[in-house]
Amino acid sequence: MKRISLILLWGFCSMALSNVSFHGYLVQPPNCTISNAQTIEITFQEVLIDDINGSNYEQTVPYSITCDTAVRDPLMEMTLSWSGTPSDFDNAAVSSNITGLGIQLKQAGQSFTINTPLVVNETDLPVLTAVPVKKSGVVLPEADFEAWATLQVDYQ
C-alpha cells in the first residue's frame, strides 16, 4: 500500500490598512451681471440700404461685466455668449423685424457665432461690435428696423 502524504503549506498573507482622508474647499461661482442688468441700446440712425455690406455702420457694443465676489477657482472659466433668433443667411447675425436684414455681432473683427461661448477675462473684456447685414439678392424696404439679442456670461 502506498502512502501519499500531502503537505499543506500555509501561506501567510499580510494585509496593511491605511486611513484615507478627503478634504477640500467648496467654492460658489460668483454671480455676474452684464451692464448692471440694463438693456444695451445700439442706435444705427439712418442706414442707406445700398451701403449695408457687413462693415459699414459698425458700432461698438458698450458692455461691462461685474461679479459679486473676487473669489475665483483657477480651474473655472468665464465665458460670454449671445443668443437670439438667428437670421436665415448668417449664423453670426440675429434676424430683425425686416425680412433679409440682420444684425451681426463681431469679436476682434471676426464673426461671433450665436450660442458659441467665448472664453473671456473679466479684467480685459473683448471689444464687441454690431453691424447690419443683409441677405444677398434681397430688396429691403425703407422702414424702421429693430432686432433683439441676449448677452450671457457663465462661470464654470
Located regions from the model:
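Mature extracellular/passenger domains of Gram-negative fimbrial/pilin and adhesin proteins
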Residues: 2, 16-156
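Sec-dependent N-terminal signal peptides
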Residues: 3-13
